């Protein structure tokens, strides 16, 4: 199956180009605002619309800075040490979920203190917004024809531009489904009942780690790294500890009494 030609630029205004991938980020942050606002209301938190906007803005900064720094440190440090000016060339790509997660956690701790909310409570109301952004982001990867999967002979294999002219797993779509609607529904199911603060967040950590670990078996490893430990990629080495930590913490936190 040939990759459908989709122009990565959806709108041009003179020399300005607006790309689908950037649009996915914007839509993800907009959706996050409404999801967090609704979740805060259900929790009875005294957060105004401006407070929620402050939270989303802080987390967005954490995602962007952490995601960029994480990619540099985890995936391509030697290149950026040799080309330091490329550190700021974010339009060329290069973002890491795991770095973005660390950035979000740090930003979340900061904004939780500013708004006088317990971090576990804030993490719980924000966690369901993450799958929306993740799912949209993976669709952006697919539109760009990047982060494609390994060579395959399955009927739905796609020949991506730059993919060697052979069918590959559309692993971006696998991730879009698992990290998007599937993970969102899991978090919504967990959050339906009143639970100790932090359970929803740690459930997100566990299932993201699990889904990412599994999909990495179908995803082409980063060219500059390859497989690092037997059949495992960098993404798997970062994701499996997430799964173990998230699962352990979700079980431990769920045993506490309900409350902030």
UniProtKB/Swiss-Prot annotation:
It is found in: Cell inner membrane. Pfam families: LGT. It is a multi-pass membrane protein. InterPro entries: Lgt. Keywords: Cell inner membrane, Cell membrane, Membrane, Transferase, Transmembrane, Transmembrane helix. GO terms for cellular component: plasma membrane. Pathway: Protein modification; lipoprotein biosynthesis (diacylglyceryl transfer). A 1,2-diacyl-sn-glycero-3-phospho-(1'-sn-glycerol) binds at residue 138. It is an enzyme of class 2 (transferase). The chain crosses the membrane at residues 16-36, 55-75, 87-107, 198-218, 232-252. One of its GO terms (biological process) is lipoprotein biosynthetic process. Catalyzes the transfer of the diacylglyceryl group from phosphatidylglycerol to the sulfhydryl group of the N-terminal cysteine of a prolipoprotein, the first step in the formation of mature lipoproteins. Belongs to the Lgt family. This is Phosphatidylglycerol--prolipoprotein diacylglyceryl transferase. It comes from Geobacter sulfurreducens (strain ATCC 51573 / DSM 12127 / PCA).
